[in-house]
Design a protein with these regions (language model features):
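Glycine/serine-rich anion-binding loops at beta->alpha junctions
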Residues: 90-106, 151-156, 285-288
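Short Gly/Thr/Asp-enriched flexible loops that form oxyanion-binding sites at enzyme active sites
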Residues: 51-54, 82, 101-115, 159-160
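C-terminal charged capping/lid subdomain of soluble metabolic enzymes
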Residues: 313, 317-388
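A glycine/threonine-rich phosphate-anchoring loop and its flanking beta-alpha core
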Residues: 13, 27, 114-222, 315
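Buried hydrophobic positions in well-ordered alpha/beta secondary-structure cores of metabolic enzymes
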Residues: 18, 39, 74, 99, ...
Length: 388
């Protein structure tokens, strides 16, 4: 029997895939009738030949570039980006980059809509869900939208929320609004060509984490199972192929589509669980990049949950190409094959940090979604020991 639920169709219009990004962007800007396009990116993209290609394709519609985005999209850089958009009189933001760039552009939208001009002003909007992500709000016409062109596999472009860090307090906070999902996503595998291979592989494992935790969920539905299973097949085969042959654009295209599908289960109401919750805490407390948190945590989380969802985990193992139904081993084998870190100690995490990490993770809302109930920080420390 299929459990009751709801599938939400978000305020995203198009996902363009497999076409040259510069030409596709020019066509989308024409369709959207935008005249002042600000590119939001980081210094590495801004200093590459990519930016010149986009500027040429946009012609007089190119209003400039904000290249000040840094890791974890600090509040200050978001405020500076919003000021650049105001100065350019921008009517469209084009985010070219990975998760930090796309998150920064989303929070810039919020700053522009509510005239936030100081980092402290963001506090009034953090951590709050603002509206149903499938419902167009009354003020929709007052939002400047985003076209996202990803260069990694973080899949930030497929959500209606973004994060910005506050270095003074040592936290990264979520900001949420239905209009923060990009209006258009353009997936061009060539846009990943300059991405360092370790970053491509670890963000690919983050996408594996998205799909695996959704496929492991006890409240899963047929839509979620279909998209999450295929996401794992595309991602596992694509990661192996890209690792063997970095110039294989077909593999990179499969990876982009797999990252897209890894997020689709969320649209049918299926959330991720404890792996993501501990990953959030690990990133905040120990500054471990999210892709590396997935590599070091996910196999242990699956093993800890195995008694609660063994049948679901067999689906994961099969989608990863394993002959046996042990998802933890199948994931560990994939991570080892890719030459990525497999243990928390490999990424500089000390056992001394476990109590603080466990405390943060226990308070994360995603912990409630875990197939096996998490009753104490001791449960989480047990997983951390398994992963260390």
């Amino acid at each position: 029997m299929i459990a009751p639920g709801m599938h939400r169709f978000l305020l995203m219009e198009r996902v363009v895939h497999g076409r040259p990004a510069a030409a596709a962007l020019a066509e989308e800007v024409d369709r959207l009738e935008r005249r002042r396009v600000l590119v939001v990116t980081n210094r590495s993209v801004a200093n590459s030949a990519l930016l010149a290609g986009f500027a040429a394709s946009l012609g007089e519609r190119y209003a400039g570039c904000f290249s000040g985005v840094t890791a974890h999209s600090p509040r200050r850089c978001v405020i500076e980006g919003a000021e650049a958009a105001r100065a350019a009189n921008a009517d469209l933001l084009v985010a070219i980059g990975g998760g930090s760039v796309i998150d920064a552009a989303k929070v810039m939208q919020l700053c522009l809509r509510h005239d936030i001009r100081d980092p402290a002003g963001l506090s009034d909007y953090s951590g709050r869900g603002r509206g149903d992500p499938s419902t167009r709000p009354a003020d929709a016409d007052r939002w400047i939208r985003i076209v996202a062109i990803p260069t990694t596999l973080s899949a930030a472009e497929f959500t209606w929320f973004g994060g910005a860090s506050d270095p003074e307090r040592g936290v990264k906070e979520p900001f949420t609004h239905p209009m923060m999902i990009p209006q258009v996503v353009i997936m061009d595998p060539a846009m990943t060509a300059e991405t360092p291979m370790p970053l491509l592989l670890t963000t690919g494992m983050k996408a594996v984490d998205h799909a695996a935790e959704r496929l492991a969920a006890l409240n899963a539905n047929p839509y979620n199972d279909a998209v999450s299973s295929l996401a794992l097949r595309l991602l596992s085969s694509g990661l192996r192929a890209a690792h063997r042959a970095p110039a294989d654009m077909g593999a990179r295209g499969d990876l982009q589509y797999g990252a897209f599908m890894s997020m689709c289960g969320s649209w049918s109401g299926i959330a991720v669980g404890l792996g993501h919750a501990i990953g959030h805490a690990l990133g905040a407390h120990c500054a471990v990049p999210h892709g590396e948190t997935s590599c070091t945590l996910l196999p242990s989380v699956m093993r800890w949950n195995a008694d609660a969802n063994g049948a679901r985990q067999a689906l994961i193992a099969g989608a990863l190409g394993a002959r046996e139904g042990d998802a933890g081993t199948a994931l560990a084998d994939l991570i080892n094959e890719l030459g990525l870190p497999t243990r928390l100690r490999d990424v500089g995490v000390s056992r001394d940090a476990f109590p603080a990490i466990a405390h943060k993770a226990l308070g994360d809302v995603l912990t409630r979604n875990n197939p096996r109930p998490v009753r104490s920080t001791g449960d989480i420390e047990e997983i951390l020991e398994m992963a260390w």
